[in-house]
């Protein structure tokens, strides 16, 4: 099945500590999770690796969030929206269910 949320989509968080925040999808994982820019930040304790020039310390990075907890953001309506699929000129395209506009990739 085609993915409803893809890389570089603008999404809004529906649940969790970052509810209501918007961000861009940087990675879609096969486990049904997405990594969103600036959302779900966690602190990771990085061990130093002098051979590779990696400095140790506490670093902040984005953790994965379940795809069910995000929705694509429709700029035309200014709200979260649902995605549908249809065929246009023999190609399968995504569209917003609220206003029928196609999603630009």
UniProtKB/Swiss-Prot annotation:
| Keyword rRNA-binding found | yes
Q: Name one GO biological process term.
A: translation
Extract the SMART domains matched here.
Answer: KOW
Its job: One of two assembly initiator proteins, it binds directly to the 5'-end of the 23S rRNA, where it nucleates assembly of the 50S subunit. One of the proteins that surrounds the polypeptide exit tunnel on the outside of the subunit.
Q: Which gene encodes it?
A: rplX
Q: Please give the Gene Ontology molecular function terms for this protein.
A: rRNA binding; structural constituent of ribosome
Family recorded in the similarity comment: Belongs to the universal ribosomal protein uL24 family.
Alphabetized InterPro entries for the sequence: KOW, Rib_uL2_dom2, Ribosomal_uL24, Ribosomal_uL24_CS, Ribosomal_uL24_KOW, Translation_prot_SH3-like_sf
Superkingdom per UniProt = Bacteria
Traced from the root, the source organism's taxonomic lineage reads: Bacteria, Pseudomonadati, Pseudomonadota, Gammaproteobacteria, Vibrionales
Q: What is this protein called?
A: Large ribosomal subunit protein uL24
**Entry keywords, A to Z:** Ribonucleoprotein, Ribosomal protein, RNA-binding, rRNA-binding
CDD domains associated with the record: KOW_RPL26
Can you cite an annotated GO cellular component? ribosome
What is its quaternary makeup? Part of the 50S ribosomal subunit.
Q: Which NCBIfam families match?
A: rplX_bact
């Amino acid at each position: 099945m085609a993915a409803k949320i893809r890389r570089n989509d603008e999404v809004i968080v529906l649940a969790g500590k970052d509810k209501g925040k918007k961000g861009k999808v940087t990675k879609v994982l096969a486990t049904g999770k997405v990594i969103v820019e600036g959302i779900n930040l966690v602190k990771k304790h990085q061990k130093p690796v002098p051979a590779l020039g990696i400095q140790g310390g506490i670093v902040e990075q984005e953790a994965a969030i379940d795809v069910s907890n995000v929705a694509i953001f429709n700029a035309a309506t200014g709200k979260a929206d649902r995605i549908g699929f249809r065929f246009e000129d023999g190609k399968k395209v995504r569209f917003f269910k609220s206003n029928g506009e196609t999603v630009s990739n």
